[in-house]
Curated annotation (Swiss-Prot):
This is Protein DJ-1 homolog D. Optimum temperature is 45 degrees Celsius. Residues 5-190, 198-383 form the PfpI endopeptidase domain. The gene is DJ1D. Cys-120 and Cys-313 are oxidized to sulfinic acid. The lineage of its organism: Eukaryota, Viridiplantae, Streptophyta, Embryophyta, Tracheophyta.
Length: 388
């Protein structure tokens, strides 16, 4: 994309899983080049992430998230080549705020006046770099006293999706604020979003893959789309548990518990014809959703009306069960090849695993590493553009 942008994400061990991956993949989907670095690590190394979620206790709980692979080397970073900086939250900022090279990097970005977007506990690094003195900012509530001590004009996060802008500084309280957080960052980079007045429906289920619902969901929200999520036998406000599927050297993916995902609409009240596109996440949910006639009828309705349908990983099990793959070119997670072939689809090998394909109104992807292309191809079908 002509005149696009390049941004840097400052990573660390046990940064929050969503707070690194959602901006990382959303920004790439919008045509922005994104580099990720961690002090003491090189391109190809990985950082373990943390899942932070709420289950009724007085504070969040933590469990292991995905392994996040870095694509650049910290010691080789030339800050003059970057147009903006993103700082995820989680536990990583606690120790990164004590790392001199990290603090100096943030100071240099601040002096340049380039946009800095920091979320949740990431603002601890901003405080250590003396970049919040006299500036309005928010953060996860427990970070407030540190920011006040650093001279910030503290904005209380009344809701978890609060975002605050002060000049080139964008801050947010938690990953629930990602849609506005990312949209504000794109705007600060000089981006313009057009064609996003669309309504998108997500077909969800228990133990869908964590990234495969949250990344496209919040990416589309960040563009300005109205995005709804439904699940059979559940209502608005109910939650679906998710599964973290990762590649850790075994013969197949591993599974760990992920975040819980909040639904926005009652399944039984759904008027599917009011939506412009359908998204089907992968994970284990499609195995049982493919047995639900109401779900299959929704898929048939979208395909028969030639509205965009985007399905990833194991989501194509639902497409096969709905009988909509006959004569269509399609990829999926490799283990789903049998479903695709038996369903009459023409199998497209996902090599590499982040390959995505568009055949008419159908976008298919193999796994969550392909989200940037997956979301980008859906944007193309919907006529949504991000320009700089």
């Amino acid at each position: 994309m002509a005149n696009s942008r390049t941004v840097l994400i400052l990573c660390g061990d046990y940064m929050e899983d969503y707070e690194v991956m959602v901006p990382f993949q959303a920004l790439q989907a919008f045509g922005i080049t994104v580099h990720t670095v961690c002090p003491g690590k090189k391109a190809g190394d990985s950082c373990p992430t943390a899942v932070h979620d709420f289950c009724g206790h007085q504070t969040y709980f933590e469990s292991r998230g995905h392994n996040f692979t870095l694509n650049a080397t910290f010691d080789e970073v030339d800050l003059s080549k970057y147009d903006g900086l993103v700082i995820p939250g989680g536990r990583a900022p606690e120790y990164l705020a004590l790392t001199a090279s990290v603090v100096e990097l943030v100071k240099e970005f601040s002096r340049s006046g380039k946009p800095i977007a920091s979320i949740c506990h990431g603002q601890l690094i901003l405080a250590a770099a003396d970049t919040v003195n006299g500036r309005k900012c928010t953060a996860y509530a427990t970070v407030g006293p540190s920011l006040v001590a650093a001279g910030a004009k503290w904005v209380e996060p009344i809701t978890p999706d609060v975002c605050v802008v002060d000049g080139s500084l964008i801050t947010a309280a938690t990953y629930e604020g990602h849609p506005e957080f990312i949209q504000l960052f794109v705007k600060a980079l000089g981006g313009k979003i057009t064609g996003a007045n669309k309504r998108i429906l997500f077909l969800c289920g228990d133990y869908m893959e964590d990234y495969e619902v949250k990344v496209p969901f919040q990416s589309l929200q960040a563009l300005g789309c109205q995005v709804d999520a439904v699940c059979p036998e559940k209502k608005a406000g109910d939650r679906c548990p998710t599964a973290i599927h990762d590649f850790e050297g075994d013969q197949t993916y591993s599974e760990k518990p992920g975040h819980t995902f909040a639904l926005t609409t009652n399944f039984d009240d759904l008027v599917s014809s009011s939506y412009d596109a359908l998204v089907i996440p992968g994970g284990r949910a499609p195995e049982y959703l493919a047995l639900n006639e109401h779900v299959l009828n929704i898929v048939k309705e979208f395909m028969n009306s030639e509205k965009p349908v985007a399905s990833i990983c194991h989501g194509q099990q639902i497409l096969a069960a709905a009988g909509v793959l006959k004569g269509r070119k399609c990829t999926a997670y490799p283990a789903v090849k049998l479903n695709v072939v038996l369903g009459g689809g023409t199998w497209l090998e996902p090599d590499p695993i982040d390959r995505c394909f568009t055949d008419g109104n159908l976008v298919t992807g193999a796994a969550w590493p392909g989200h940037p292309e997956f979301v980008s191809q859906l944007m193309a079908l919907l006529g949504i553009q991000v320009s700089f």
